[in-house]
Amino acid sequence: MKFRSLALARIRGFTLIELLVVIAIAAILATVAVPALQGTVRDFRQRSALSLLVSDLNQARGEAIKRNSRVLLCVRNAAGNGCAASTNWLSGWVVCTTDAVTSTACDTASSPNPFIVRPALDTSLTLTVTDAASVALSTIRLNANSSQGAGSSAATLTLSGTWSGATAHTVTVASTGNVSKH
């Protein structure tokens, strides 16, 4: 019986001082790791938005060929069901078909239209879309013959972050409709 009580006497847990030392070390490590993690999360959001944009441009080009019609990628309106007369691409974008040659509006008669609706981008990102003359665009038009249409030139989409040290990524849509990421 005496042996059992000695064994129980030796079993102990952490002392309060040991616990406080472990908590202090964990706090120091967290303080060092959090800023690096925030940068990683921001870079991931930017790359994710870029991949989504390139994917939507390629899908718009493919849909134009598949449907043998004109397809628009344009700034999303507030309702999310068509194009806005704005160059603020941060509000999101839609991909839809249009029937008119120079139209910047979705064809509401076809269904489903728009067939891609993207929500607003993260506020830490900026997206600008310009033509060859650096004029801001609200619409990119892709035609069934793999071109952007009469009088269209290449469009350049630039996605960058608002934080210091952010890298700007550029996507070019050639007048032939080819999408390339730089």
Cite the ranges covered by each PLM segment:
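N-terminal helix-rich module
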Residues: K2-L6, I28, V32-N58, G62, ...
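Glycine-centered recognition micro-motifs in short, flexible terminal segments and loops
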Residues: F3-A27
